[in-house]
Design a protein with these regions (language model features):
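Outer-membrane beta-barrel domain signature
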Residues: 72, 76-81, 133-140
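Short alpha-helical scaffolding segments that buttress acidic/His motifs in well-ordered protein cores
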Residues: 94, 108-112, 155, 159-162
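Helix-turn-helix
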Residues: 17-20, 24-62, 66
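Hydrophobic alpha-helical connector segments
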Residues: 66, 76-105, 151-155, 179
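N-terminal intrinsically disordered/low-complexity leader segments
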Residues: 1-16, 193
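Hydrophobic/aromatic residues within well-ordered alpha-helical segments
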Residues: 17, 60, 67, 71, ...
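Hydrophobic/aromatic-rich alpha-helical bundle segments in the mid-to-C-terminal region
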Residues: 121-122, 126, 141-193
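Amphipathic alpha-helical segments used for helix-helix packing
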Residues: 99-129
């Protein structure tokens, strides 16, 4: 069916629409912050009509929450969290969050900061952090670290800070050096073999 006047022709394959819209939200926010997030901007990025975006999500907040939930999967995947190996391999792929999924990383930090001002986003941010902490606990254990929830939270906070700094300063060598030091700390504390 041809697009009518005022409508964009969809470049999104059937069954991939929701994910394409969520990825478009991530891209729009990563590029211009939440202030740039509109139905029209998401529609233009995804190659669909803005009515379709509104139909799928209903409100701007629902769009942000859904994209925040979506963003956890790619963020965990790119960093290799949960892949078993030796402590020497642990967190080796974390710097990829700054290259392969930079938009996801930037999007998440934008939403996290916005949740300070907008309590309606806090639950989504809380769920995001809970997902990261759960993945970190499993990842530490898969690498032979005797970890509990508190240690997973501490280690995740350190990595999260490194990623935030890396996003702002683009100094991957600093991130890698700090991760090596964190491995040494885990080993010297007797928490890993």
């Amino acid at each position: 069916m041809a697009a009518t006047r005022g409508e964009a022709k969809s470049d999104v394959a059937y069954g991939e629409g929701r994910e394409a819209l969520l990825r478009a939200v991530v891209t729009v926010v990563a590029r211009g912050g939440l202030r740039e997030l509109t139905y029209r901007a998401v529609a233009a990025e995804a190659g669909v009509t803005h009515g379709l975006v509104r139909h799928h999500f209903g409100s701007r907040d629902a769009l942000i929450v859904a994209a925040t939930e979506y963003s956890l999967g790619p963020a965990i995947s790119v960093t290799g969290l949960g892949e078993a190996g030796s402590l020497d391999d642990w967190a080796r792929d974390v710097p990829k969050a700054l290259t392969d999924e930079e938009e996801i990383t930037a999007f998440q930090f934008e939403v996290i900061l916005e949740s300070r001002r907008r309590p309606e986003l806090r639950e989504a941010v809380s769920d995001l952090y809970a997902g990261f902490r759960k993945a970190m606990l499993a990842d530490l254990r898969a690498h032979g670290v005797q970890a509990d929830k508190a240690l997973a939270t501490l280690v995740f906070a350190a990595l999260d800070g490194l990623i935030f700094e890396g996003l702002a300063l683009n100094e991957p060598q600093t991130t890698r050096a700090a991760i090596r030091k964190l491995r040494e700390l885990l080993r010297s504390a007797g928490l890993a073999g």
